[in-house]
């Protein structure tokens, strides 16, 4: 009985072992059939391909760029507003009825162009009266001078007294004074008549008219007839931090005009290029900034008064600078660093000293050299000494994207 009992247990154990072996055989066959051909081939080519769990994982894909040596312009940037070089409110200098306007709203005018006319009738009358009085007094003077000549002859023979001669001399002098006053009155009346024709005091663009024809206007009107803004040239007033003052002053001492660029509100389109005109004479204590004025020819009317723009002033150009994409520059506990690729596509961390930069590129003053390859994308997957796969970045495919890329390359860097 005891031998048969043991035999039954042996049979049970053998059956269990056979079942387990059959299960593992079936499971391994399914894994083999479901494996991708590429993965199978990679496993066969791998030195450890015959051992489960020892196959190497795929390399981390990254994008890279080469550090280049180039001249990098240094810009100071600020926000500003376009202002007219001159703004003039055209007012009448005499009182009267507005008879005519000789401009179109928004028109460009030259200094001296006729803008408006006031009824000249009263001024013509006043001029005629002054001229008449002058003629009358000139006749009186001529008569007084003739009498004086006679008195002088009679005085020689004592036919007139010395007192009478002096009185006649005084009359002549008085009449001469009257003549000068009359001449001034004529000039004043002529000036009043001239002022009835209102002309442009400066070159510029006229705005909207402030008064209609037929209205009575006076020299005391505050609104005036029209406002002229001088836009050729035109100015840009922007602010810089007080820390930039020394840089601007040093650049001015070089003797060359400092170029100032005006960019649109989104800082994506260059509107015009001018030169630095002046610095303000004091710092705004509230904001810690100083006002700067630049002047633009604006012959294409790209700039308009009160327009908001981004200002960029070129103060220096750094020659032979090592430049990399800004995306490659990282910040860690030890400071700024970049991941550098060697010839085997293995990465290593290099501490660097950055210089001037913008959103596209950064100058590296120390830590790498021109020709070094740095990782620009896929940085979060990197570890020291890891081998990576370098893939190409997706390039600009449309003309607009290419143009934008070229424009960023021209814009340079800022401090």
Curated annotation (Swiss-Prot):
Disulfide bonds: none annotated. Residues 1-21 form the signal peptide. It is a peripheral membrane protein. GO terms for molecular function: efflux transmembrane transporter activity. Residues 399-415 have a biased composition (Basic and acidic residues). It is found in: Cell inner membrane. Its main location: membrane. GO terms for cellular component: efflux pump complex; plasma membrane. Keywords: Cell inner membrane, Cell membrane, Membrane, Signal, Transport. Residues 31-56, 392-415 are annotated as: Disordered. Residues 31-46 have a biased composition (Polar residues). Induction: The mdtABC operon is transcriptionally activated by BaeR. InterPro entries: CusB_D23, Multidrug-R_MdtA, RND_pump_MFP. Gene3D superfamilies: 2.40.30.170, 2.40.420.20, 2.40.50.100, Helix hairpin bin. It comes from the Bacteria. Belongs to the membrane fusion protein (MFP) (TC 8.A.1) family. The MdtABC tripartite complex confers resistance against novobiocin and deoxycholate. Part of a tripartite efflux system composed of MdtA, MdtB and MdtC. This is Multidrug resistance protein MdtA. It comes from Escherichia coli O6:K15:H31 (strain 536 / UPEC). The gene is mdtA.
């Amino acid at each position: 009985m005891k031998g048969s009992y043991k035999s039954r247990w042996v049979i049970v154990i053998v059956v269990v072992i056979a079942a387990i072996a059959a299960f593992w055989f079936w499971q391994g066959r399914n894994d083999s059939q479901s494996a991708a051909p590429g993965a199978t081939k990679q496993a066969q080519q791998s030195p450890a391909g015959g051992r489960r769990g020892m196959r190497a994982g795929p390399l981390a894909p990254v994008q890279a760029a080469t550090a280049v040596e180039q001249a990098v312009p240094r810009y100071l940037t600020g926000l500003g507003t376009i202002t007219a070089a001159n703004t003039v409110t055209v007012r009448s200098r005499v009182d009267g009825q507005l008879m005519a306007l000789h401009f179109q709203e928004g028109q460009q005018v030259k200094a001296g162009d006729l803008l408006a006319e006031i009824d000249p009738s009263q001024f013509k009358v006043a001029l005629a009266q002054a001229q008449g009085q002058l003629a009358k007094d000139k006749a009186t003077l001529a008569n007084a001078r003739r009498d004086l000549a006679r008195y002088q002859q009679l005085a020689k023979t004592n036919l007139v007294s010395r007192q009478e001669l002096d009185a006649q001399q005084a009359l002549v002098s008085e009449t001469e004074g009257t003549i000068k006053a009359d001449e001034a009155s004529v000039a004043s009346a002529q000036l009043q008549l001239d002022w009835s024709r209102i002309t442009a005091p400066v070159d510029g663009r006229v705005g909207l008219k402030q008064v209609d024809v037929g209205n009575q206007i006076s020299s005391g009107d505050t609104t005036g007839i029209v406002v002229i803004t001088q836009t050729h040239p035109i100015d840009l007033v922007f602010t810089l931090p007080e820390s930039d003052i020394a840089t601007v002053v040093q650049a001015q001492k070089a003797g060359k005009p400092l170029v100032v660029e005006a960019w649109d509100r989104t800082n994506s389109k260059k509107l015009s290029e001018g030169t630095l005109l002046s610095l303000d004479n004091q710092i705004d204590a509230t904001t810690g900034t100083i006002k700067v004025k630049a002047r633009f020819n604006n012959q294409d009317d790209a700039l308009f008064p009160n327009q908001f723009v981004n200002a960029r002033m070129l103060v220096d150009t750094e020659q032979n600078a090592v430049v990399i994409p800004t995306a490659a520059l990282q910040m860690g506990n030890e400071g700024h660093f970049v991941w550098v690729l060697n010839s085997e596509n293995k990465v290593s961390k290099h501490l660097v000293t950055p210089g001037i930069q913008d959103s596209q590129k950064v100058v590296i003053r120390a830590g790498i050299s021109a020709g070094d390859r740095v990782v620009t994308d896929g940085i979060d997957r990197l570890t020291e000494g890891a081998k990576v796969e370098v893939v190409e970045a997706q390039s600009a495919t449309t003309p607009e994207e290419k143009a934008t890329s070229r424009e960023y390359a021209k814009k340079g860097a800022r401090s």
